[in-house]
Amino acid sequence: MTATASPSDTKGAAAPRISFVSLGCPKALVDSERILTHLRAEGYELSRRHDGADVVIVNTCGFLDSAKAESLQAIGEAMAENGRVIVTGCMGAQPEEIREKYPNLLAVTGPQAYESVVAAVHEAVPPAHDPFLDLIPPQGVKLTPRHYAYLKISEGCNNRCTFCIIPSLRGDLVSRPAGDVLREAEKLVKAGVKELLVVSQDTSAYGIDTRYATSPWRDREVRARFYDLASELGELGAWVRLHYVYPYPHVDEVIPLMAEGKILPYLDMPLQHASPSVLKRMRRPGNQERQLDRIRRWREICPELAIRSTFIVGFPGETEAEFEELLDWIREARLERVGCFEYEPVKGAPANDLGLLVPPEVKAERKRRFMEAQAGVSLKLQRAKVGKRLQVIIDEAGPGGARGRSKADAPEIDGSVHVASRRPLRPGDIVTVKIERADAYDLHGIAV
């Protein structure tokens, strides 16, 4: 995910100007929004171009080598076009690599270092704040369209997957108080947000670090617990979509909320693999037969449930037999939304010590076979929707029609619904669409 701050809502002539690039996952996007909100509250304006700014901030991603390369490229472009650059984010936790290539950066800070970023901006270009021109919207500065927003409920992660270095970059799990999360969500909904996308490194672990501590919300106390938070969010009148959910037993508790229509029947659950031996090397939950049984039970409770997952092929030591286990599992699981990545070594990850690297051409071939198998599953599931009427939230609209998403589709990572309509549609509208045609990943229909 790459996002650039838009200056469309800024005013004033003498205020210092900031250009901002946000790379990586939705959690990083929320970090970017917090930084921008703080700076806008101090009177800074946003510039669409690097060469029109007083300073450039690049929020980096350091999860994969390819993400690091993208971050370094973005830093290089900012240096070339402006020369006054502040770097933050996950890659900033390892500043030596950045400083070696770009020694003249103004500052390099790590993830979640909001105060350090703001301090670096102050040092580079002091604020010229005018409270009479302070028109910050109550929901803060957002890098997403106005009708949806990411809601981050915690930082860090307690898991120690061998392919991942996030805990070393962002630390252990730190959950936000439930009352704080709910107040932010309420503010977003009042500002016109129609869809809340709940994100963290491990959403289903929410509150474990606080022993499910309570905090005030409206006229009552609410526990910092996965089910309790999901239930309360479901009362705010917006679509609520759960991302990055581990397959813990207590996930079962939220499925009835989906069946009742309180939250979206959508579960983003990165499973990573299906072979018990590969999962053991990954240090991931390993009983996928039991997981199949749980998925069947979930679908009995909530037939509309859409499960999204991501998988890694070519993990060190992955044999053809282990890969075939994965193929068999996805054919049986019939997941609605699936992504697949070729394994990339990450500096500092324990998986690097496993040896037995899978050749690049084998990884590419396995990814092709995996996506081919999933496309067949997806096409059958999509065709079953032809003739049905689905609620669709509109993302883009024009004279030739509109594009939106069903309850089974998250922005940027899932499919779209292409909508023909006799009446004008606007982004953020939620309309009923009769599905007339289906592709492997997209649907086509008419607004009714």
Swiss-Prot record:
Q: Where does [4Fe-4S] cluster 1 bind?
A: 25, 61, 90
Catalytic activity annotation: L-aspartate(89)-[ribosomal protein uS12]-hydrogen + (sulfur carrier)-SH + AH2 + 2 S-adenosyl-L-methionine = 3-methylsulfanyl-L-aspartate(89)-[ribosomal protein uS12]-hydrogen + (sulfur carrier)-H + 5'-deoxyadenosine + L-methionine + A + S-adenosyl-L-homocysteine + 2 H(+)
- Quote the protein name from its UniProt record: Ribosomal protein uS12 methylthiotransferase RimO
HAMAP family, sorted: MTTase_RimO
Give the keywords, sorted.
Answer: 4Fe-4S, Cytoplasm, Iron, Iron-sulfur, Metal-binding, S-adenosyl-L-methionine, Transferase
Pfam families linked: Radical_SAM, TRAM_2, UPF0004
Q: Kindly list the positions annotated as binding [4Fe-4S] cluster 2.
A: 157, 161, 164
Binding note for cofactor: Binds 2 [4Fe-4S] clusters. One cluster is coordinated with 3 cysteines and an exchangeable S-adenosyl-L-methionine.
What's an example GO BP annotation here? tRNA modification
* Record-annotated Radical SAM core domain positions: 143-380
Question: Organism, per UniProt?
Answer: Methylorubrum populi (strain ATCC BAA-705 / NCIMB 13946 / BJ001)
Q: Which family does it belong to?
A: Belongs to the methylthiotransferase family. RimO subfamily.
The EC number(s) this enzyme carries: 2.8.4.4
Cellular component terms, GO, for this chain's entry? cytosol
Q: Which InterPro entries match?
A: Elp3/MiaA/NifB-like_rSAM, Methylthiotransferase, Methylthiotransferase_CS, Methylthiotransferase_N, Methylthiotransferase_N_sf, NA-bd_OB-fold, Ribosomal_uS12_MeSTrfase_RimO, rSAM
Ranges where the TRAM domain occurs: 383-448
Q: Which cofactor does the UniProt annotation name?
A: [4Fe-4S] cluster
Where is the protein localized?
A: Cytoplasm
GO molecular function (one): metal ion binding
What are the residue boundaries of the MTTase N-terminal domain, all occurrences included?
Answer: 16-126
Q: What does the record give as the function of this protein? A: Catalyzes the methylthiolation of an aspartic acid residue of ribosomal protein uS12.
